[in-house]
Amino acid sequence: MHDNYDVLIIGGGPGGYVAAIRAGQLGLRTALVEKQHLGGICLNWGCIPTKALLHGAEVAHSITHASQLGISVGEVNVDLQKLVQFSRAVSQQLTGGVEYLLKKNGVRVIDGTARLRGKGQITVADARGEEYDYRADHVILATGARPRALPGIAPDGEYIWTYYEALQPKRLPRSLLIIGSGAIGVEFASLYNDLGCKVTLVELASQILPVEDAEVSAAVRKSFEKRGIQVHTQTQVTQVQLTDTGVRCTMKNTSAESFLEVERVLLAVGVQPNIEDLGLEALGVELDRGFIKTDTACRTNVFGLYAIGDVAGPPCLAHKASHEGVICIETLAGVEGTHPLDRDCVPGCTYSRPQVASLGLTESTALARGRPVRIGKFSYQSNGKALASGETEGFVKTIFDAETGELLGAHMVGAQVTEQIQGFGIARHLEATDESLLSMIFAHPTLSEAMHESILAACDQPLHQ
């Protein structure tokens, strides 16, 4: 088997495997090196298994509250291990599908750990430590990222968790403190609360979900606190100590220090790129805050070397990584009409209860950039489908440029908003204005009508409020 390739990709996550498939489709001799599992964090320990667990928890919640619809049920019991097994089975099914697609498109998968030993030169060590050399005209780094630790608070796999342990608990802890309230922290807070765990959520910033619009963040916090989740913002966990029953945590906010004892602690303070032992230093690869620096076509400062996905910097999202994989391959293959990534068109989704979805600028960011804005907002409480479904918690908020009509941002909180945000993504991608969106017809009754009503409100033409 040949050891020279047009493209060699290091890392088989959503960025790497999609890049490999596209390269194979374009007729490029392609190899993919993966040291653990095809599908990366997303399919194995992130996006997919968390959604399976969240689905189970939400079903349990719906059954528990079915009496509101006149449906009587007995006591609801969740077999945690069966739920975990279901999530693992879903992941395995999808990773098997990735393996099939790579084979179908002529991609050679190499098991092992890769490092660069020169321009276009790669050495791969297999599980036995034996090394093999390869050459490629183009090398793509798609090595992803891993959970970040805090000084003095290191995961131990038993009492102090990362998402690895949180996805496959041996038993449900009675209490859980989550450090960090980004998408990962908020999703696990929602999950464990629905399963019956007492959850405390701690965030250093002034709001949970710090990257989201302030109104959306406030709505999620209000919902969480109503459910019994304790939320502390502008608070830092300064120390953890193991006890006979769990972990004693020292927390400090702007005015005081407090203590909390819990059975488990989950670190959800972001990720750090996997750049160690790749050989970047010897090649002089430029970094930006620890991430590999790239241009709009995913090229590094070293000719023939590219980086995509989490290792190339935020937003650390699977769909952004996959899109970069396609952009990278089509650029190096000379495909006409390839467009660079528009970061303002990258949707963000948080699958908590209530769900959160957004794209583009928040209100505060738009104002900080000096954009004149017109804002529309519509509540689920006035939406017929939401009322019929008993899902009245939430709203849709749209932000337009007051002068040009450009859609600057869309922010949604509530049931199924992660399935609706694509509508705003299409609108922004096609450069639709408020005027053109006004004339769209939305099916009735649907939750998506709240999208249209928010646009109408932004244009001072509200119909149902």
Functional labels for PLM-detected ranges:
Residues 2-13, 172-182:
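Beta1/beta-strand and adjacent pyrophosphate-binding region of the FAD-binding site
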Residues 74, 108-111, 115-127, 195-296, ...:
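A Rossmann-like FAD-binding core segment of flavoenzymes
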Residues 8-10, 114, 133-144, 179, ...:
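Short hydrophobic core segments
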Residues 47, 143-198, 202, 231, ...:
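Glycine-rich dinucleotide-binding loop and its adjacent helix/turn
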Residues 8-15, 19, 24-36, 41, ...:
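Flexible, glycine-rich terminal cap/loop adjacent to redox cofactors
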Residues 11-16, 144, 180-185, 270, ...:
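Conserved phosphate-binding and hydrolysis motifs of nucleotide-dependent enzymes
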Residues 156-172, 259-336:
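FAD-site-proximal beta/loop scaffold in flavoenzymes
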Residues 2-5, 21-28, 33-172, 200, ...:
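Glycine-rich flavin
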